[in-house]
Swiss-Prot record:
GO terms for biological process: negative regulation of amyloid fibril formation; negative regulation of canonical Wnt signaling pathway; negative regulation of DNA-templated transcription; protein folding; retina development in camera-type eye; RNA polymerase I assembly; RNA polymerase II core complex assembly; RNA polymerase III assembly. Its main location: nucleus. This is Prefoldin subunit 5. The modification N-acetylalanine is found at A2. The gene is PFDN5. GO terms for molecular function: amyloid-beta binding; unfolded protein binding. Heterohexamer of two PFD-alpha type and four PFD-beta type subunits. It is found in: Nucleus. The modification N6-acetyllysine is found at K42. Binds specifically to cytosolic chaperonin (c-CPN) and transfers target proteins to it. Binds to nascent polypeptide chain and promotes folding in an environment in which there are many competing pathways for nonnative proteins. Represses the transcriptional activity of MYC. The keyword Nuclease does not apply.
Amino acid sequence: MAQSVNITELNLPQLEMLKNQLDQEVEFLSTSIAQLKVVQTKYVEAKDCLNVLKKNNEGKELLVPLTSSMYVPGKLHDVEHVLIDVGTGYYVEKTAEDAKDFFKRKIDFLTKQMEKIQPALQEKHAMKQAVMEMMSQKIQQLTTLGAAQATAKA
């Protein structure tokens, strides 16, 4: 369980260590949200692509992606069914409507995960800001104390 620490009682090296730890946590949470957004965008694009599957497009020619930059010509034969990558190399055949529902559920799940992470990220940012302000105060106190001691010696 996390222990509560009063940052006013910490010295500068301890505050620096705490700031570094908070930097790492903020970076991790920011990266996590960015990765979730990338995956969510892929699901949104996949869901949007299903709109091409209409009866009047059956038999039309199209370009089938082999990689992100290489395509081959193809024909759209079945507009009712699609294969969906469900992870780890497994594909499931679904109707276009079921596929839309699948992608909507995935998008909603990722949105909820990002909403769970966002408050933690904001809290870490606020904690980091408080630590930086305390560090600034401690440095100012040390500077003032050093100047006062130098004046007293003179």
